[in-house]
Amino acid sequence: MNEEQRKAGTINILAERDRKAEKDYSKYFEQVYQPPSLKEAKKRGKQEVQYNRDFHIDEKYKGMGKGRTFLIKTYGCQMNAHDTEVMAGILNALGYSATSDINEADVILINTCAIRENAENKVFSEIGNLKHLKKERPDCLIGVCGCMSQEESVVNKILKSYQNVDMVFGTHNIHHLPEILEEAYLSKAMVVEVWSKEGDIIENLPKVRDGHIKAWVNIMYGCDKFCTYCIVPFTRGKERSRRPEDIIDEVRELAREGYQEITLLGQNVNSYGKDIEGLDYELGDLLEDISKIDIPRVRFTTSHPWDFTDRMIEVIAKGGNIVPHIHLPVQSGNNQVLKIMGRKYTRESYLDLVSRIKEAIPNVALTTDIIVGYPNETEEQFEETLSLYDDVQFEHAYTYLYSQRDGTPAAKMKDNVPLEVKKERLQRLNKKVGIYSQQAMSQYEGKIVTVLCEGSSKKDENVLAGYTDKNKLVNFKGPRESIGKLVDVKIDEAKQYSLNGTFIQEHQRSMVTQ
């Protein structure tokens, strides 16, 4: 999709701040804004994705931020963290300086998450808390961006109740931040620019990475799976893959800069490459090419079981810098619930995939996501989730109560599992999660593990902390020079969700040759 096509899907809203709240805000939309629609989204056909490698900031915007500061608050997934790095890079290029003091920031951006109702509530609370700041410092700009901005109901709520917000923009037009800022400075009205359809892939965007040890590397955008509970296909758009050469160049540059670990990101990384016409190249091929680059650790997230290929298993099994940790969300252990969720696999096919992974990679650490209390979930169906957990023996799981999201097919289902029942099931599941986590941790007692030291422990400045290749948190006392390096640590104590150990030495590793 080129820029002219993109403009056809652009939404611009100018809402007067002092206008009284009204129930219908459609009059503020210069073009019709379509709310998330499964029917319409599924109609999105294959469109040629344009790759823009010539991103630059117009000279007229440079210096816009001279003498001004910015702060970005980030909610949600790793993709949002990556988007924040890009926005920080653009703001730096405009002359802004970062600050950690929200009371001093001249530009405040709230990068939002729409995956669960609780996340949205936190964001609205945050925006509300900024009302007093806007009164005290009317010249500061407050912006709301990220996935929540792609929802019409959210935009309407901001228009109605949060007139302290100066600008709202979505996930597809971050590279237009200079133009959005300029409009916000010049206008006395709220500026909302939300692209209802995904855009081109923009390369060479500036980034301010969070630290110099680990880095996010986006390999694709969007999702075409349409799980019935998930808003992501609507807020992030259709699947679009970056070109392999662009990804590999970025990873090589990170290796030259001394980064010790990268994580390949996508809403569904297993679909990587499928949308690139004339290219027979999948995630397994990308992993193999990246394994030849001298960077100690390579991770990827998130995987959908339906797309997990034998080629991927083969490459991970070779070892090297591809870590033996696979996050494989199952969501439920019951076939009927999985079908209603639109997950496209069965309990049996999932367990078969796990069996193939474990056979090829005996030392693999498997983790997962599980939703409890999906509409119509019975006690017997939930118990099948518990039994699947026993079968797989995941080393950790992220567990959630079902959260209804407006605009998804599941929102039309009756949320008929009582909250008390949901909480009781979650408690039982988490008890099992703790048991298997303790079991996984206990095997490390007395052993020496390699840890990527990331800094001081959150609980004790005198203790260092880092993660193993299987993503186990390790706390240990050692020299400050260990920060940013791979070190060997002897494990003295295995706790349920972390390990305590003693520093041995800096880890000696062999170079990867291309």
Swiss-Prot record:
The keyword tRNA processing applies. Residues 442-505 form the TRAM domain. Residues 68-186 form the MTTase N-terminal domain. It comes from the Bacteria. Its cofactor is [4Fe-4S] cluster. Its EC number is 2.8.4.3. GO terms for molecular function: 4 iron, 4 sulfur cluster binding; metal ion binding; N6-isopentenyladenosine methylthiotransferase activity. It is an enzyme of class 2 (transferase). It is found in: Cytoplasm. Residues 209-439 form the Radical SAM core domain. SUPFAM superfamilies: Radical SAM enzymes. It holds the Pfam family TRAM. Its main location: cytoplasm. Monomer. Catalyzes the methylthiolation of N6-(dimethylallyl)adenosine (i(6)A), leading to the formation of 2-methylthio-N6-(dimethylallyl)adenosine (ms(2)i(6)A) at position 37 in tRNAs that read codons beginning with uridine. This is tRNA-2-methylthio-N(6)-dimethylallyladenosine synthase. It comes from Staphylococcus epidermidis (strain ATCC 35984 / DSM 28319 / BCRC 17069 / CCUG 31568 / BM 3577 / RP62A).
